[in-house]
């Protein structure tokens, strides 16, 4: 396959990353080539709408970006995947497809339809290896927003802005386009918070994190949620791990619902959340069995086990997350099984998940609200795949729009990443964030 390294180098220098949540640099996925490119528009988290907005309103950029990915990697097939209920998006994309090697595949409305392991098998029939990546089987999966911005980078634009969904207790819920580094406070001032108690989340209700007004938009930020307190406690209880361990030891009913509904388990991957949480809760001095640790590494952290499946409100997902942070992945071979006969019957419909989370009232139409251009941005230096970024500017420096202001050293083989200024400005501060004021 012919790989266009010049295009891939432009993608690298632009700092484009996976915008579906992973944040893995796009160039690193593209540089080894592929046979199939999947533009993932499943947008499976409840209430999110920004990917649908992009597909409805920028279909030519998506198809051009998909073609760019194909020619850059040598791929012979391009596929746009999106849910069959996204009627407007499907119509917009179909009108732009002129080539026989590009197709649309429509997905059923379940969570998590966008999981790469599940998506790749559904679309291609190929199975991602245990603990592996789609690139190992000749498939690259990019979020549709990544594909959109790839087309802009090829036109010479820097990757400095992104789209986000703003949902919940706000007067103007919908899609916003903002510079990377925009403070949540500035966004919510535009969206107009209602005068009610709320708690903030970012990125997703199932896989996202707690947030506050001082947070700033990162490359991977996909959404801001302002939820009522009573709802937010269901979505993300943020329980300390020692309490989770004690609760599991005393309250686990051994019902196996967490495993029975686990999408990765149903897909045949070696993970059994009920065994992991039991083994961890009964371990002494964190002497956890290696097989338990190895299984935890197959968790996608989708959250079904703790938010939907467990009748005792235990937290297998948080246990898996903790194990992956606290323990090195062991050299234990776990085989892959056939997909469960119950895979289709146990898919979790989004409508049922929304009802369980008590968030029906916050569903909103796919609509663009505004482009926000604040006078100041705060660009984080942490949280990037590869390494902590090192600033390339100092206090009082003037910077131009698109200028690389921080990057990491990729000469040692590390994954390269950078961040660019979203406008002409002056550096006010260089600490854990680079603060830029517009001039």
Labelled PLM ranges:
Residues 126-129, 143, 333-370, 434-437:
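Extended boundary segments
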Residues 227-249, 259, 264-341, 374, ...:
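Ferredoxin-type iron-sulfur electron-transfer modules in oxidoreductases and energy-metabolism complexes
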Residues 76-186, 190-195, 204-205, 228:
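Hydrophobic alpha-helical positions that pack around
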Residues 365-387, 407-421:
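Short beta-strand-turn/beta-hairpin segments enriched in glycine/proline and small hydrophobics
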Residues 389-398, 402:
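Short histidine-centered loop motifs in beta-beta connectors
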Residues 37, 56-73:
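Histidine-anchored nucleotide/phosphate-binding helix
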Residues 38-51, 170:
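Gly-rich Lys/Arg/Thr-decorated short loops/hinges at beta-loop-alpha junctions or inter-strand turns
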Residues 207, 241-244, 412-431:
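Short, compositionally biased
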């Amino acid at each position: 396959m012919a790989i266009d390294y010049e295009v891939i180098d432009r993608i690298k220098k632009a700092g484009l990353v996976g915008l579906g949540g992973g944040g893995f640099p796009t160039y690193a996925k593209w540089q080894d080539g592929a046979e199939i490119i999947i533009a993932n528009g499943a947008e499976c988290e409840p209430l999110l709408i920004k990917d649908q907005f992009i597909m409805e309103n920028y279909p030519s950029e998506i198809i051009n970006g998909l073609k760019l990915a194909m020619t850059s990697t040598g791929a012979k097939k391009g596929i746009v995947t999106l849910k069959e209920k996204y009627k407007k998006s499907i119509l917009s994309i179909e009108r732009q497809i002129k080539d026989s090697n590009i197709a649309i595949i429509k997905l059923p409305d379940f969570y998590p339809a966008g999981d790469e392991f599940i998506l790749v098998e559904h679309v291609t029939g190929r199975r991602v290896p245990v603990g592996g990546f789609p690139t190992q089987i000749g498939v690259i999966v990019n979020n549709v927003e990544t594909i959109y911005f790839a087309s802009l980078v090829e036109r010479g634009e820097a990757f400095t802005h992104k789209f986000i969904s703003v949902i919940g207790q706000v007067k103007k819920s919908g899609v916003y386009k903002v510079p990377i580094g925009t403070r949540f406070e500035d966004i919510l001032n535009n969206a107009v918070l209602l005068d009610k108690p709320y708690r903030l989340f970012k990125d997703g209700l199932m896989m996202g994190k707690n947030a506050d007004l001082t947070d700033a938009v990162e490359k991977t930020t996909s959404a801001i949620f302002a939820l009522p307190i009573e709802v937010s406690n269901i979505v993300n209880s943020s329980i300390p791990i020692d309490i989770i361990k004690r609760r599991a030891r005393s309250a686990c009913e051994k019902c196996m619902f967490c495993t029975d509904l686990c999408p990765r388990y149903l897909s045949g991957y070696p993970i059994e959340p009920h065994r992991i949480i039991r083994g961890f809760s009964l371990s002494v001095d964190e002497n956890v069995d290696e097989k338990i640790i190895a299984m935890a590494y197959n968790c996608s952290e989708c959250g079904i086990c703790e938010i939907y499946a467990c009748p005792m409100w235990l937290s297998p997902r948080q246990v898996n997350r903790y194990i992956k942070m606290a323990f090195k992945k062991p050299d234990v071979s776990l085989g892959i099984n056939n997909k469960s006969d119950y895979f289709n019957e146990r898919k979790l419909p989004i409508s049922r998940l929304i009802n369980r989370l008590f968030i029906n009232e916050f569903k909103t139409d796919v609509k663009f609200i505004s482009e926000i251009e604040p006078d100041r941005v705060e660009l984080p230096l942490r949280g990037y795949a590869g390494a902590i970024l090192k600033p390339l500017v100092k206090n009082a420096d003037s910077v131009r729009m698109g200028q690389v202001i921080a990057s990491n050293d990729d000469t040692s083989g590390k994954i390269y990443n950078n961040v660019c200024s979203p406008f002409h400005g002056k550096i006010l501060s260089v600490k854990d964030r680079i603060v830029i004021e517009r001039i």
